C-alpha cells in the first residue's frame, strides 16, 4: 500500500486507481465512572469509527489465487474467538488506551494529519491482545500477495467484531455497547482488518510495504507522544498525560507498544517495508501480554487493599476523635460536679453559721432577724453565678477546640458542658443556655432566694422541709389488724414513709399487706400521732343485751323444754298437749330434730314447748334447748327409771340454772314403779316435793292423757314464780333453734324470739349470715307478719344457712349487717387457719404416728336435712374412732346432695352419706359413672352402726394361737427325695399335719414354720396322739437334731370391731 505525505487528507492506495479516505476517525467524550466502594471519577472516552468501503471496492481487488489458500487458516483460528466473548471481553480493553495517546498527540499537532493514525492503532491492537494466533496468521498471508491484503482478510472479519465493543468497554462500558451494533452493518469487516497489520505489528506487515510514505508520516506524527507514553509494562508515564491511570488499557498498551514504536520513530518519515514477526517474537509478545495482565490484577488488588486500609484508618481516627471528645466532656462534667459540690458545701456551712448567729440573737428584734436572712440570702445568690463562671471557661475552650473539627466534617457532636451550670443552678425552662449567657450569669441573677431554697431542699431529700413544716398530730383509731394503705390514710401520711419505717425494722412489706395493731401503734407513735386501740368485736357492741326500762316490760309466755332419755315418751307427751300426732311422722319413732311449738294452757295463757331429741348424739341440741328455755320438764319412764340421757338432761338444766319439773310418764303400764324413779333421782340430787324437796313432780300418761292438766298447771305456777317479762316494743332478739336448706324456700331458720318483736322486712343477723325477713311461718304452717317474745317461727330470707344455736338480732341497716357478718366470717376463717396451722405444725408427729401405729382414716361426706342433725351425726361419728382407725369428715352441710359433693368424693375417695336428703339426678349419674357410693339414712342409729361396721373392716385382724401338743425328736433319718425326717414321740396333746410348729433347742426357739409331712409306720396320717411315735418333716428347713422339742399349735384369725 502507498502512504502519501500530503498535509491534507491521507489517502491509502491498496491498488492502482483506488482511493480510501479517512475522515474524523476519533470522537471524544467524558463519562463518570463509579466504583463498588462508593467512589467515582471522570473518564475521557474516545470513540473510533470504522472505515467504510464501497461495495465495489470490497470485491474489486481480486488478488492472486495463491493468497486465498494462505488466508484460509486465519478464519479457522479466529472463528472460535467470537464464540467465547466472555474471556475475550477484558482483554481487548487495550485498544481504547492506545486511542488515548493518539488523542494526546492530536491535541498539540497543528495539522489534523495525525488524526487518522488513531484508528490504525486501536483496531490493530485488539486482535493482538485477544489472541496472537490470528495476528500471526495475517502477516503470513501478506508476503504472498501484499496488494491483495484487504480482500484476503475479509473472511476473518468476525475476529474484530468482539474487539470493537470490548475495546471501548474499559473506557466507557455504557457508551460503547450501543456503538458496536450500530456500525456493524455499515462497515465491511475487511476494511477494519486491512490496516490492522500496519499498527499492530509495527515490525513489518505486507500492508505497510505498499504504503511506506503514509506509514512514515503517521509514525513521525505520533513520535513526540509515544516515547513519553511508552514506559514499559507498568506504564509509569501514563498518569502524567492527564488520562486515567491504573486501568487495564494502559498496562496492555505499554507492553507491546513500548517495544515496537521506538523502532518506528527511528525510521523517521521514510517508508520502509517491515519484516514479519518471528515465532520467538510472537511468543515473547504473548508472554509479555500475560505478564502485563498479572501485574494489572496484582495492582488492582493492591490498590483495593490500600483503599480499604485508608478507609479503616480514617474511621479509626474518627472514632478516636469522638472518644477523646467524650472523655474531655466527661472530665469537664466531673470538674463541674466537684466544683458545684464544693460550693454547695461552702454555702451550707455559711448558712449554718448564719443560723447559729440568728439563734443567739434576741427574738424580739425584728431588724436583727431580717439581717441574718439577708446575710443568709446573699451568699446563696452568687453561688450559682460562681458555678457558671467556673464552668464557663472550660466550656468555651472546648467549644473553640470543637469548631475546627465541625468545620472539618466530623459528625459527632458531644453534649456541651455548658448545660451543667443549668442543672447545678437548678434553672429549668428558661430558654436555651449558651456559653455567653452562662459566663455572664444573667440567668442566675434573675433567680430568687426562694427558688434556690427549694432546689436545696430537693437536693437534701426534703429534710429542711420536714423540719420546718408544722406537724399535725392526729388521733389514729387502730383495729386489731390494718393494711398499710389504710394506716397511712388515717395518719394522713404517705404510704412510702410507712413502708420505709417498716423496712428499717427489717420487714419487707407491700402497701396492701396487713400488719397487727402493735406494729401500727409503734409506727404511729414514731410519726408523732396519738393512738386509740379498738377491737373488731366492737362492731357487735349494743347488738345484744341492751337494758330495757322496767315500765316497758310486759309478761311473756314461758319457754318449756322437754328433755329425757330416748323412748321415754317426750314427743308423745307433747303430742297429747298439742292435740297433734308428731310421733307418727317420725322415722323410727324417735325425735331427731329439735322442734318448737306453742300450746294454749287451760288457764288461758300460752306455753312454748321445745322438743329435744333424747339420743346420746344430740347432746348439743339439748344444750341449746336448755339455754333458751325458762323451765325444763324432765320426762322419766316409770318402767325404765333414770337412764344416762336423763342424767345428762339434769346436768344441762343445772348448767342453764333453770327450774326443773319431773314428769313420770307411762304410769299406765303394769310394771310402772314411780317410787323407784323418785329414789333414783335422789342419787343425782333431785328431790321431789313428795320426798320433802322443792322440785315439782307430776305422774302422767301421754297415751292415756292422764294428769296432763296438772302438768300444765305446774308449768303455769312455775312461770308465775319466775315472773317472766319482756319488752315487745324494741328490735327483736332471739336464738336459732334449728336451721336447714330447703330446696324451694332456700335457707330456713327456726327462731325463738326472746325479746322484742320480729317483723317481715327487718334486716337480721344470725351468726355469719344476714338477710331481710321475707316471711314468718308459725309452727302450724300459717304465715304471720310479726312474732313477739317467746314465739317460735320459721324465718325465710337469709343469704346463707345459719348454724343452730346462733343468736339473732335485728340491725338498723344492711351496711351494719354486712360489717358484722364480715367480721364474723373473718373470725371463722382465722380459726380455721389456726387449726390448719396446728395440723401443719404437728404434721411430722402425725405422720410418724401413722407409720408407727398404722392408723387409718375413713373419709366421709355428710349431708343432712338440718344443720342440727348434721352436727349430731358428726359428733357421733367422731366418737367411733380409736388409735388405729378414725372417721374423717371431708365435708358436711345441710341440703341435698349435688354434683360438687360427688366430685369432692371422687377426688378424696370418700363415701357420701345422706341423712333425710336425696341426691339429684345429675349427682346420681355422676356418682354412677365415678363409682361413688351414696348411702341414705333416716335414722341416726342405722347410720352410726353402718359406719362403725365399715370402720371395723379397716382394723387389722388379730391372730390367736391354740396349743395342740409337743413332740420330742428321738433320731434324724435321711430319706431320699424328702431330705431329713425327724423321728419323734408325741409327749402331750396331738400333732396335726399342716399346722404351725416351733423347733425349740435348749429352750430357745430356733425355727417357726409349718409341718410338711406327718407319717406313722410309713403311712401319712392327719394327726398323731400323745404317746405315739411318728416321723415329721418341716417346710424348707432341715437343721433338726436329736433332743429338740417340737411345739405344734393352731393359728386363728379373729376379726376385730369397734
Curated annotation (Swiss-Prot):
Q: Where is the composition biased (Basic and acidic residues)?
A: 1-12, 292-364
Q: Which sites bind GTP?
A: 564-571, 611-615, 665-668
Give the region (G4) as residue ranges.
665-668
Q: Where is this chain compositionally biased, Gly residues type?
A: 244-271
Q: Which CDD domains would you find in this protein's record?
A: IF2_eIF5B, IF2_mtIF2_II, mtIF2_IVc
Extent of Low complexity compositional bias = 54-81, 96-108, 120-156, 164-228, 368-396
Region feature G2, mapped onto this chain: 589-593
Q: Which keywords are on file for this protein? A: Cytoplasm, GTP-binding, Initiation factor, Nucleotide-binding, Protein biosynthesis
Region Disordered, residue ranges? 1-468
A Pfam family hit: GTP_EFTU_D2
| HAMAP family found in the cross-reference section | IF_2_B
Against PANTHER family, the record matches this protein to: TR-TYPE G DOMAIN-CONTAINING PROTEIN, TRANSLATION INITIATION FACTOR IF-2-RELATED
Family membership noted in the UniProt record: Belongs to the TRAFAC class translation factor GTPase superfamily. Classic translation factor GTPase family. IF-2 subfamily.
Record protein name field: Translation initiation factor IF-2
Q: Which organism is it from?
A: Azorhizobium caulinodans (strain ATCC 43989 / DSM 5975 / JCM 20966 / LMG 6465 / NBRC 14845 / NCIMB 13405 / ORS 571)
Q: What is the lineage of its organism?
A: Bacteria, Pseudomonadati, Pseudomonadota, Alphaproteobacteria, Hyphomicrobiales
